Amino acid sequence: LPVPYFVFGDRKPYSGCIEYVDQAMDYAEKYGLKVLIDLHTVPGGQNSYDNGGITGVCKWHRNPKEVAYVLYVLERLGERYGHRKGLLGIEVLNEPISFRVYLFAPSRKQALDQGEAIGSSHVPMRFLKTFYKEAYETLRAVMDPEKLIVFHDGFRLSRWKDFFVKSGMKNVMLDVHVYLWVLDSFLHFHNP
């Protein structure tokens, strides 16, 4: 279930939607289903795509205040749903973009407000690993231990080998999105 960072309605001008997440959880429990809550957007964007909430902008990771805010949102989601029967788990961040995807994906669009895009870049691996450790600790502290904490590979699958085990993380899952529509761009870039 994709949710935005303003899910609780505390970021103007956006209205929240937490009542719909509550409803989805109620329905899931009523009908024996499980919900994976996926934090799909962050303030300032994590991938520069529309599904990250703001096209052409990717600079959330450069703003410590917004990074802390996202951890706070995850904590609140974990507190609210971490003991619910209908929760499968929480995915901490949808599709943080890698350097290669940021530069070469064919559908990358320009920001409507070019000024807002200033400072945008890919999400560095070092930052992502640090953020994932913090998100894990934040969620694990407030959720039942059998609930999954899910991490997107950031389009860098091979870079996660042993990371979760070496970090001592339990009951985690790595989410991988394979988009064949970008394959030609990558092949052409690597094999001109």
Task: Indicate where each model-derived feature is located.
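Residue-level preference for alpha-helix termini and adjacent loops
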Residues: 4-7, 59, 70, 74, ...
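Short acidic/His/Gly/Ser-rich catalytic and metal-binding motifs that mark active-site loops
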Residues: 7-10, 43-52, 99-102, 184-186
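Extracellular glycoside hydrolase catalytic/binding regions
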Residues: 72, 86, 93-192
